[in-house]
Amino acid sequence: MKTRYVLSCLLLGSALSVSAQKMAVKSNLLSAANGALNAGVEYAFGPKSTFDLSGSIRPWKRTEGYVNKYWLIQPEYRYWTCQKFNGSFWGAYLNGAQFNVGGKKMPFGLFPWLKEHRYAGWLAGGGISYGYHIMLNRHWNIEVSVGVGYEYIDYKKYKCPDVCAELLEKGHYRYFGPSKASLSIVYIFN
């Protein structure tokens, strides 16, 4: 009886290891360039399907006139057009964040009001993404991904970026447009 139990465990264990799925860890270089700590993990659960969970946090500010503190979490389902962790993928993602930003000029003229005021609040939304993995070798990849989606933003607007600035208004904003961008270095476990 004991021998059967041990053999059953060994067979089950070997069957699980044969069908073991790939897993990857990553870091978004765009988020890191902004001074944020970030990490992501992606798990393959089918021949063309993966689940990615990424997060980012920036708990400090740079100067008195510039505030850029936030945390963000983003789960995403990905469907790979060829094979997982190689080539093109389409994704559907959700995201949630809490922010305290102001005194910053955004690139490409986005959100020009952030230069003069400070905004604190939270957001939740989701969208669709497209990305591409470039294989460097067996373990290392580069990933580029962009997404378009909807964000519900609940905010408080302050007169200036100072922490003790006068509250001007409370409100919410519905945003539709680019809501995800990543350039990540990826390590794949086999």
Regions found by a protein language model. Give the residues of each.
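Flexible, solvent-exposed loop segments that connect beta-strands
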Residues: 57-67, 98-122, 154-174
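Outer-membrane beta-barrel "beta-signal"
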Residues: 175-190
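Membrane-embedded beta-strand positions of outer-membrane beta-barrel proteins
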Residues: 25-27, 41, 53-55, 75, ...
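Transmembrane beta-strands of outer-membrane beta-barrel pores
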Residues: 29-33, 55-61, 79, 94-100, ...
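Transmembrane beta-barrel domains of outer membrane proteins
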Residues: 42, 78-81, 131-133, 186-188
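Repeated loop/turn-to-beta-strand initiation elements of outer-membrane beta-barrel proteins
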Residues: 23, 48-53, 85, 139-142
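Solvent-exposed loop/turn segments connecting transmembrane beta-strands
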Residues: 24-40, 58-69, 84
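Outer-membrane beta-barrel channels and translocator barrels
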Residues: 34, 46-48, 82-86, 135-137, ...
